[in-house]
């Protein structure tokens, strides 16, 4: 919510979201909404089924695969004459059901040169994941067979998910920008024992490699505890990797 400028948070002035705002201005803006499960896969399963996680059976990302035999929103719409599609992140450890067309990222998906799974194969696609998902979504919309049929499209972007790797054209976009801190950045935990007991270790839970883009060397023992370089540097072409490291080297 803080990241969408339509809600008026100060971050929205630094990084506005005009296209999302337009959807709100022309449609509806939810003021009292909540997320029943903030983890990516379970949240997606809840949206698909309209059920809480303990009811739809997908409670964590590394659980058994989502049960695609149960009733879902796309199945209902498909049965009522809608053309259905899902493009982008899926991460439900099972193939999509209820969709006439699907093209999903492999597992969590990669930011650079990601692998896409379709009904027939898994293929590596050169490019930045946000650009590719947008491109394939537009191609599906333009190439729909039933132009007069209603459609239901789920476009799931990877880029809201850590490790927040920008497109190369954005490496220096906010280099000299100071972002306002959220109100609870320096929260007070006195008298809140349960909150104190939650994992608060910055290195373990924040992943400095993910969030600060600090790479100490691909052969460093510290990489055993830092999943960030292995998460996407390996999918970059050698020249892409060099440009990325050069962009952050001086800042680190």
Give the location of each predicted region.
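Formylglycine-dependent sulfatase
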Residues: 1-252
